[in-house]
């Protein structure tokens, strides 16, 4: 099996994400998946570090002649992602209705065709990120919301809604989809990061 896509991820050096990068890498090696995982310097906040996602993806699309499967670094591959090579679209990610928020774009697993349309989409995503700095308690400013806005603006961009097993949040989706076996499971390290950095003991992020 020789995939035509490259799995990519990045993490902030000297943080808890560094250990998780090793877990992700081992899971990719289990299925002989070509991958590139990059370490970056801390940009000053979790919000800025997450907004780096679009820049990172742009860099890879411009430097590689491959389609890209981006995953957050706290993810692990549980089986070979058979769906990905067969996708006939420009972009694919999961849009999910949660009880606390509907129509939520999940950018933790994101497939991108390496073509000019997608590159224009990523440029627009970056523009939206730069226009409104992310704020932790305002989901409408998060990078994934800007990604969704950019995708919906571009009516010629072919979108596919990934099934839940490809962006399987380890606890919430286990309850929502009890009979679904995850292909790519996400462990939501951002929750721990927020708890450590917030002085309010009752603080909780729904992600």
Predicted region positions:
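Short coil/turn segments at beta-strand junctions that form active-site/ligand-binding loops
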Residues: 3, 64-67, 73, 157-158, ...
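A structural signal for short, well-ordered beta-strand segments and their strand-loop junctions
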Residues: 36-38, 69-72, 92-93, 158-163
């Amino acid at each position: 099996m020789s995939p035509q896509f490259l799995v990519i991820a990045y993490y902030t050096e000297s943080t808890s994400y560094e250990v998780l990068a090793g877990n992700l890498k081992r899971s990719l090696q289990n299925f002989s998946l070509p991958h590139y995982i990059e370490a970056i310097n801390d940009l000053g906040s979790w919000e800025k570090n997450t907004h780096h996602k679009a820049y990172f993806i742009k860099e890879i699309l411009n430097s590689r002649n491959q389609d890209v499967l981006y995953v957050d670094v706290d993810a692990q591959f549980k089986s070979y992602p058979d769906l990905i090579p067969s996708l006939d679209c420009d972009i694919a990610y999961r849009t999910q209705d949660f009880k606390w928020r509907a129509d939520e774009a999940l950018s933790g697993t994101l497939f991108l065709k390496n073509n000019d349309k997608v590159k224009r989409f990523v440029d627009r995503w970056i523009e939206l990120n730069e226009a409104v700095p992310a704020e932790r308690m305002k989901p409408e400013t998060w990078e994934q919301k800007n990604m969704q806005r950019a995708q919906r603006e571009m009516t010629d961009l072919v979108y596919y809604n990934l099934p839940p097993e490809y962006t399987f949040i380890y606890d919430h989706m286990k309850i929502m989809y009890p009979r679904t076996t995850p292909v790519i499971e996400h462990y939501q390290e951002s929750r721990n990061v927020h708890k450590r950095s917030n002085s309010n003991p009752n603080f909780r992020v729904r992600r």
